[in-house]
Amino acid sequence: MNDPRKTESTTHFGYQSVPESQKARKVAEVFHSVAAKYDLMNDVLSGGLHRLWKRFTIELSGVRRGNRVLDIAGGTGDLTLQFSRLVGESGEVLLADINDSMLKVGRDRLLDRGVAGNVRFVQADAEKLPFPDNHFDVITIAFGLRNVTRKEDALRSMLRVLKPGGRLLVLEFSKPSNALLGKVYDAYSFAFMPLAGKLITNDADSYRYLAESIRMHPDQETLKSMMAGAGFERVTYHNMTGGIVALHRGLKP
């Protein structure tokens, strides 16, 4: 009988090659570590630009009153907060995250902001979403897809739970379109990000993983092809901040 440890598929965890069964646990450890300071670090590392990137995502989503929205890897709830206001009492927003530490921070933050009634919190794996077919008008995943082990499975799962005509928006770090910007961004990522992580969260390794995971994530055209391959139509993307971040959008037929 073959030893399954010798045949198990591997994937990347940053620049490391690890068995697929271990990646989810390693990613979970990262986000358990950074959850409490996640919002602060977003502001520090992006200079506040993440708020503009998310605002554009909300604008392009076309969410309106009465919609049902799924915010995957919703974390501390930035998108969910805005979506809850847009869908109103007749709509619903589900904040889903596989990491219970991030989910707790998001739940506490939104409750402190008075968000209730039209928001639910669900611990869920993007690769196996626990929702009915044809259920959501809009799905977003912001800065989460690169941490998913089997991205194609996750995209197919998202397609399944979207209503026909529904929209998926993937906001993610990507590849700078200018070579000089890319060099500056690399220097920033591998020097400043781990240092800031050490000073603010006492965890340089998690932010070193962040920098590495960005480099291992598919570039704009590859992700566009992956979304089309999963069954999405009219897939487009918008580069922001010189391609450091890209917003992909696709429709379910």
Curated annotation (Swiss-Prot):
Pfam families reported in the protein's UniProt record: Ubie_methyltran
One example GO MF annotation: demethylmenaquinone methyltransferase activity
Pathway: Quinol/quinone metabolism; menaquinone biosynthesis; menaquinol from 1,4-dihydroxy-2-naphthoate: step 2/2; Cofactor biosynthesis; ubiquinone biosynthesis
Positions bound to S-adenosyl-L-methionine: T76, D97, D125, A126
UniProt xrefs under InterPro entries: SAM-dependent_MTases_sf, UbiE/COQ5_MeTrFase, UbiE/COQ5_MeTrFase_CS
Domain of life per record: Bacteria
EC annotation from Swiss-Prot or TrEMBL: 2.1.1.163, 2.1.1.201
Biological processes annotated in GO: aerobic respiration; menaquinone biosynthetic process; methylation
Reactions that this protein is recorded to catalyse: a 2-demethylmenaquinol + S-adenosyl-L-methionine = a menaquinol + S-adenosyl-L-homocysteine + H(+); a 2-methoxy-6-(all-trans-polyprenyl)benzene-1,4-diol + S-adenosyl-L-methionine = a 5-methoxy-2-methyl-3-(all-trans-polyprenyl)benzene-1,4-diol + S-adenosyl-L-homocysteine + H(+)
Keyword tags: Menaquinone biosynthesis, Methyltransferase, S-adenosyl-L-methionine, Transferase, Ubiquinone biosynthesis
PROSITE patterns: SAM_MT_UBIE, UBIE_1, UBIE_2
Similarity field: Belongs to the class I-like SAM-binding methyltransferase superfamily. MenG/UbiE family.
Function: Methyltransferase required for the conversion of demethylmenaquinol (DMKH2) to menaquinol (MKH2) and the conversion of 2-polyprenyl-6-methoxy-1,4-benzoquinol (DDMQH2) to 2-polyprenyl-3-methyl-6-methoxy-1,4-benzoquinol (DMQH2).
PANTHER family: 2-METHOXY-6-POLYPRENYL-1,4-BENZOQUINOL METHYLASE, MITOCHONDRIAL, METHYLTRANSFERASE
Protein name as annotated: Ubiquinone/menaquinone biosynthesis C-methyltransferase UbiE
Originating species: Azotobacter vinelandii (strain DJ / ATCC BAA-1303)
